Amino acid sequence: MLDVREWENYSKGRVANSEWCPIFPLEDDSLADEMTTYAKDHLNDGKDIYLICNSGKRGAEKATGVLRDAGIEPTSIYTVEGGAEALGKENGALTTDRTEENIDWKYVAGKDAVDKVGDKDVQFLDVRDDDTYKAGHLKGTLQCSQKEFDTPEAQTEMYNLAKDKMDKDEPVYILCYSGNKCAKNSNLLVIERMQDLIQIICLSLRMEQKTEMYPQLL
């Protein structure tokens, strides 16, 4: 499943485990170039591709042409009739919950993560709420609350942070409450924005630990 809608619509509901490579706005030729690169790197494996656009028309038509030009076998490209508009009428077809995606989650112990604080080759991202973050966090972390992780607003905030402030070539350590839902949700958002990211790791670090044990805590 390849979703080619713009972020605003995509963030409101997507097919679970679908991939995302936008072709909207259609007049933006740079998106066609990005899709060409994405297709060559990620879609050239002989598997069938089901395209999801807004209504199953213009976006899917343009994406089909781009994929064909990128070398994808035309007989393996399908358009989902009616696009996301039709899928939205099917109970449970679209979701904003990304925590159960098929991905090989990586974890690191809190102490090992703390030892990486200050490493210029590692990015730390704290996705806890603002008050919890202020009560104690690792030095030098970016912060983006994902407490309401399944809302378009929270996901858009995460998307923009990944786009504007994160380095796609460096690994990311994500800190949430327990290393579960918030971190997993953020993983998917970061992955989608930074598709060539080397490594993303969920970590659970209990901030009630005494700060003298971990001088890297603020």
Q: Positions of the model-derived regions?
A:
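Rhodanese-like catalytic fold shared by cysteine-dependent sulfurtransferases
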Residues: 7-50, 54-122, 129-173, 177-218
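Structural scaffold elements adjacent to functional motifs in cytosolic proteins
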Residues: 1-3, 124-126
